[in-house]
């Protein structure tokens, strides 16, 4: 019985020690587990929020990129349309106008009228001096002189027109003043292009 009593006492002592040491440890462990769970929950929530933020940022970036891409496409489309307009103007408008001028400005009657208009313009301004008239290299000087008549050719230094190096049209030089009044086909093409280009664009590209 004494041994049992000793064992009982030993058990009581062990139980007491366990009660004193293990219970607080269990409570501490429980608190640690609880805190860990709360912290894990908070971390998960923060991770979810961060993930949502990243997704929103990615969506915004993608949307901005898409808008920039759309804007770039629109701008590229506008540039392509403008390039097309310029190509059409060059091919249809300027080249066709140039061909028409080459035909018209090499007509002796037209060349004569241009020379006459230039001489009369100089006279109207009271400008005197030696006048030299030049016509296109593809035009007959004899035919132009006949169309002008003596009233105009008599005012020219050479008593008639000379053949120039340009295609068609006419030029008048006032030698003392070193002036050149230029109505050659090249100059006429530039003048007509500037005057008619707007009307041509509106007519051809009004729906663009």
From Swiss-Prot:
Give the Gene Ontology MF terms in alphabetical order.
ATP binding; proton-transporting ATP synthase activity, rotational mechanism; proton-transporting ATPase activity, rotational mechanism
Which Gene Ontology terms of cellular component type are present?
A: proton-transporting two-sector ATPase complex, catalytic domain
Per its UniProt entry, which superkingdom is the organism in?
Bacteria
Keywords annotated in UniProt: ATP synthesis, Hydrogen ion transport, Ion transport, Transport
Q: Choose any GO biological process term that the UniProt entry carries and state it.
A: proton motive force-driven plasma membrane ATP synthesis
What is the role of this chain? Answer: Produces ATP from ADP in the presence of a proton gradient across the membrane.
State the similarity comment: Belongs to the V-ATPase E subunit family.
> Which protein, by its recorded name, is this?
V-type proton ATPase subunit E
What lineage is on file? Bacteria, Pseudomonadati, Chlamydiota, Chlamydiia, Chlamydiales
């Amino acid at each position: 019985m004494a041994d049992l009593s000793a064992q009982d006492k030993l058990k009581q002592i062990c139980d007491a020690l366990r009660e004193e040491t293990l219970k607080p440890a269990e409570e501490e462990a429980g608190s640690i587990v609880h805190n860990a769970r709360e912290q894990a929950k908070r971390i998960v929530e923060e991770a979810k929020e961060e993930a949502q933020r990243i997704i929103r940022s990615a969506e915004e970036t993608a949307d901005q990129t898409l808008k920039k891409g759309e804007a770039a496409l629109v701008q590229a489309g506008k540039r392509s349309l403008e390039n097309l307009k310029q190509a059409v103007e060059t091919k249809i408008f300027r080249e066709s106008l140039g061909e028409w001028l080459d035909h018209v400005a090499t007509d002796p009657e037209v060349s004569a009228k241009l020379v006459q208009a230039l001489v009369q313009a100089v006279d109207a301004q009271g400008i005197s001096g030696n006048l030299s008239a030049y016509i296109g290299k593809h035009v007959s000087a004899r035919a132009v002189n006949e169309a002008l008549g003596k009233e105009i050719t008599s005012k020219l230094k050479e008593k008639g027109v000379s053949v120039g190096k340009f295609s068609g049209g006419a030029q008048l030089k006032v030698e003392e003043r070193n002036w050149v009044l230029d109505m050659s086909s090249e100059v006429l093409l530039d003048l007509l292009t500037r005057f008619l280009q707007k009307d041509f664009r509106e007519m051809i590209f009004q729906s663009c």
